Amino acid sequence: MTDRFQLVSPYSPAGDQPAAIDKLVANFEAGLAKQTLLGVTGSGKTYTIANVVQQVQKPTLVMAPNKTLAAQLYGEFKSFFPHNAVEYFVSYYDYYQPEAYVPSSDTFIEKDSSINEHIEQMRLSATKTLLSRRDSLVVATVSAIYGLGAPEDYLSLRLILSIGEHIDQRQLIRHLTDLQYTRNEFELTRGAFRVRGEVLDVFPAESDTEALRIELFDGDIEQLTLFDPLTGETLRKLQRYTVYPKTHYATTRERTLSAVDTIKEELKERLEQLYSQSKLVEAQRLAQRTQFDLEMMAEVGFCNGIENYSRHLTGKAPGEPPPTLFDYLPPDALLVIDESHVTIPQIGAMYKGDRSRKETLVEFGFRLPSALDNRPLRFEEWEARSPRSIYVSATPGPYELRESAGEVTELVVRPTGLIDPVVEIRPVGMQVDDLMSEIHERIKLGDRVLVTTLTKRMAENLTEYLGEHGIRVRYLHSDIDTVERVEIIRDLRLGKFDVLVGINLLREGLDMPEVSLVAILDADKEGFLRSTGSLIQTIGRAARNLRGKAILYADKMTRSMQAAIDESDRRREKQVEYNLEHGITPESVERPISDIMEGAREDAAEKKSGKGRSKSRQVAEETPDYRAMKPAEIAGKLKSLEQKMYQHAKDLEFEAAAQIRDQIQKLKTASLA
């Protein structure tokens, strides 16, 4: 373990990268609050940021617009920093239906959700890392602006153990219970502990493969050991260890009882308001629901929907922002916002949608007004909490450019020498026939084609038409979930089909080097899908191929088209000039075709369990394909496999248990996307 970032990479910065890295680092160290990295597709933006992180040596939070991109970034940073703490913080819900009320039909929808335990463990690991290590890099989505337990409570509850320390066993058990760990003498699972004489085994909630053994003698801690909870194998001995709470929302018994009192006061005030407005049904509903929750909290310290009382549990004033992941960041941290033109508008939108739903619940007596404070951060609150930031995008929005005040660092020249695709404009009248002839040319070369249309109906009709003419074509639409979307892109790269048709094929950040042609139908129809940024992003999908070309079908030149073409020409000019000056011959990007989550798969446990196997053993083992499974199926399969694994371990069949653990690891990784 080290407290310094150590970048591991087989190559060194090239093209525009060295100058960009130097400028970003100099601006950061000069105290510049906001700056923008404008990097074209395939210019190595992630590698550039990794170099910046290594040079500034600050804890880093990287925000991505969706789970798919966050997973890809997590895998890439994990490979760049194998000796450091690279963590993953996204929503842990596989499925989430928030509670809501529809007044027009008098329908109340109960909250329903399914939590992914593996992602919950990774979230806990992320916050622990931020609080305990300087070499921490966390990749997150907008989940980072949603309410979390206060870091002060999280830290005050932790259990610090040292060899030689005097501690009463009953006191130790009580402290673990306060951390919401459960006692289980039969099997040691994550977030549980067991007692055997003067030996306590604890499986930390944020750990995936290591458990802690505390050996006491006459009230003193004699030995602290990390061991494999599955096989019992000793991993290493420790002098000191800190056990963190099982959940971010853990709190003391005193704080819970204090919250019960303040909730009662708020309930009394709210009921008086409702009675004064003659809202008798709402008052009765609120009293009944809240009293039930209060009884649960007083008896067991928890209730369904306890997050709606988070203001009382954290001691915040009405209207104050909730604690979030940003409260866990040290003040000197670095914030990187990837694909900022998408991520920043998302941050602003989260609060408004949440607020309107909650106001209805409060108005009709389903929740107390304090439930409104269980919310994501407002945009201005997020701005106030953000440390020094780098916005990363091929098409930065007006907000990023304004905030950066002209500090825009360009990554236009690619290390591979590739230049931006040639952009051609052709008439709309014969666009489908012209497109078909272009597709046939590309198929002969073994390349792939992306086609983007304006409407779902047009995409469906075009897919059907191309299919009838013998072209292997697929259609990407909004009903396809994230995992299946990634699979379709992977199949396109593998050559299982040649043409992918869709409405919005920007898919920022996804690599498809085999695509040499991007066709944009009806490019002259101004709007969101044909804005300057959208056109540049879509054209960029062909930028990783030596034969890259973009065809815009249009009968007139719009301002967006002109701006996109001008920017593309400017970049090409700079790239060609650089290549001639340095004698560089452009080469297509060679990227192995693998699962987008591959980088995240290769954690220590999987590497360790795979090292000692013979080839014959690997062939004989069944390796099921989990990628096509839906989240609910994955959750069910996980539970079934875990039960089998623990049963094998209980029967001392450690080899069989280890094999199942490998399957679980693959399955958990499949669920990340």
Curated annotation (Swiss-Prot):
Amino-acid positions noted as binding ATP in the UniProt annotation, renumbered to this chain: 39-46
Residues covered by the Helicase C-terminal domain: 431-597
Coiled-coil region list: none
UVR domain mapped to chain residues: 635-670
GO molecular function, one term: ATP binding
Helicase ATP-binding domain mapped to chain residues: 26-183
UniProtKB keywords: ATP-binding, Cytoplasm, DNA damage, DNA excision, DNA repair, Excision nuclease, Helicase, Hydrolase, Nucleotide-binding, SOS response
Lyase is among the record's keywords: no
GO annotation terms (biological process): nucleotide-excision repair; SOS response
Domain notes: The beta-hairpin motif is involved in DNA binding.
Protein family: Belongs to the UvrB family.
Subunit composition and interactions: Forms a heterotetramer with UvrA during the search for lesions. Interacts with UvrC in an incision complex.
Function: The UvrABC repair system catalyzes the recognition and processing of DNA lesions. A damage recognition complex composed of 2 UvrA and 2 UvrB subunits scans DNA for abnormalities. Upon binding of the UvrA(2)B(2) complex to a putative damaged site, the DNA wraps around one UvrB monomer. DNA wrap is dependent on ATP binding by UvrB and probably causes local melting of the DNA helix, facilitating insertion of UvrB beta-hairpin between the DNA strands. Then UvrB probes one DNA strand for the presence of a lesion.
Protein name, per record: UvrABC system protein B
Gene source species: Xanthomonas oryzae pv. oryzae (strain MAFF 311018)
Gene: uvrB
